[in-house]
Structures are given as structure tokens and as C-alpha cells.
């Protein structure tokens, strides 16, 4: 493995290998994982779990992303957003990228097994395989519902963080997964509308390509309504308090606004603006969960 990586060191820089891990995507995942850890306990999270647990989850997420670069290199070469990625551009060979992914996954699993618990480690591995193999290798090319079905893998981080602390499953982290699961379709379908021509050229059956933009916009609006309702459940089951409820209502109302604007096609660049807002939405929603958790502890 080290030989493969060294063989391409003349062409690739550390930035290329960092790019393989999709660091911005992984950062958002780690924020939700971190929130899951803190929500799991009324006491402090042990620093070893906090540090090495999140590092292990992040390394495994980076490994899945690196595999995605290899499997999607033909698609990436067609799309303007991705044609300069390291594997597609030839700066990192597919073999080197896979070796790098194996290295990250091994290190990540090792950290999780050493510093958290077996359930957290195996759930993380299942999430890695779900994204890298089931979604990237099969679903993405097989069905316009690829994002809906494959969204479970991407929704796992708060569950992984929670289980890393507690060592067992419960309803609360599954609700956090459900929030991200409901958020995923409007998030990705908005981008798919913006990049519809490129997905069509790459022969990827994204919903706007197979069913048209109007159909997709209707479903973005419907999923946003579902997501809005789901985000109120933490308050309904007394998992969170008034601060979170107010934030969820305000953030959700803004998301619904963008989904409606996109549906009505009433503003230019509505699709990409909906996509961009959705990223901030998820980040701020989970920060609100965290802030509310500690506010309740101090009351």
C-alpha cells in the first residue's frame, strides 16, 4: 500500500489527498456526530471518545469519499464541478486512491475499536460500505431514488456519535438520523436541478433527468414539508426545549420559503440558492440542538 502511494507522490500533493476525503462534506458530518455525542449524556463526554471517536468517524467518512472519487471518475470527467478532481485529472491514480482509502478506513476502525465500542465501530463500517459500495457503486446509476435510499448512509453520523458515547441504540439518535434522512432529498435534488444537463450527459438517473424539473420541484417541496414536521419531533418528545423549537421553526420556515420559490420558479438561481441554504440549515439546526441541550442542563 505504501509503495502504491509513493509511486504517485511526484504528481500528487497532500492537498490532492485531502481533496479525496471531501473535507467540507466530512466537516458537516463531524458537526452532526459531535452534536450526537453531546446530546447522548448529561455529563461530559470523555475526551478520548470526543477526540478519537470523531477522528475515527471522520477517517472512515474520508475513506468512503476517496472510493467515491475512484468509482465516479468517468462521471466526474464530464461534469464541470468535478472534472478537476485528483483521480479524474490524473494527479492520483485509482490504485493510489483505493490504497489511501484502505489506510484511512483501517486507521478509523482501529481508533473506534480502541477508544469507543464495537457497536460504534461496526455501525461506522456499515455506513462506509453503504455509501462507498451500495450508493456509489450501484444506486447512483440504478434509480432516480438513489438519493432517498442512499441517504441513510449519509444520515448516520449523529447516531454514530451517540453510540460512541453510550454503546447502545435508542430512539433519540434514530430521530436525528431521520432529520438528516428527510433533509437529504431536497438538498441534493436542488443541486441536481442546477446541474441537470451535466447529470444527463453523464447518464446518471437523477430525478430532474428522469422525471423533469416540475416533478422534482414538487417533491422537493413535499420532502421539505416532511422534514419541517420531523424537526419538530425532538421538542414533541421532550428531547429538546423552547430554544430549539424556535430555531427549528424559523430555519424550517426559511427552507420552506426557498422550496416554494424554487417550485414557483420566481427567482433566478433558485435551485443553487436552495442547495446553499440547505447546508447552512442543517449546520444551524444541529447547533440549535446542542445549545438547547446545555441550556436545559443549566435550568
UniProtKB/Swiss-Prot annotation:
Disulphide-bonded residues: none
Q: Which residues form the signal peptide?
A: none
Query: Which BP terms in the Gene Ontology apply to this protein?
Result: heme O biosynthetic process
Name the pathway: Porphyrin-containing compound metabolism; heme O biosynthesis; heme O from protoheme: step 1/1
Q: What class of enzyme is it?
A: transferase
Recorded catalytic activity of this chain's protein: heme b + (2E,6E)-farnesyl diphosphate + H2O = Fe(II)-heme o + diphosphate
Tell me which UniProt keywords the record has, alphabetically: Cell inner membrane, Cell membrane, Heme biosynthesis, Membrane, Transferase, Transmembrane, Transmembrane helix
Bilayer topology reads: Multi-pass membrane protein
A single GO molecular function term of this UniProt record = protoheme IX farnesyltransferase activity
Subcellular location(s): the record lists: Cell inner membrane
TM region(s), chain numbering: 25-45, 47-67, 95-115, 119-139, 147-167, 173-193, 218-238, 243-263, 279-299
Q: Name one GO cellular component term.
A: plasma membrane
Q: What is its EC number?
A: 2.5.1.141
Domain of life of the native organism: Bacteria
Its biological purpose is as follows: Converts heme B (protoheme IX) to heme O by substitution of the vinyl group on carbon 2 of heme B porphyrin ring with a hydroxyethyl farnesyl side group.
Look up the further comments and give them. Carbon 2 of the heme B porphyrin ring is defined according to the Fischer nomenclature.
- Record family assignment: Belongs to the UbiA prenyltransferase family. Protoheme IX farnesyltransferase subfamily.
- HAMAP family attached to this UniProt entry: CyoE_CtaB
Q: Which PANTHER family does the protein's record reference?
A: 4-HYDROXYBENZOATE SOLANESYLTRANSFERASE (PTHR43448:SF7), PROTOHEME IX FARNESYLTRANSFERASE, MITOCHONDRIAL (PTHR43448)
Q: What is this protein called?
A: Protoheme IX farnesyltransferase
Q: Which gene encodes it?
A: cyoE
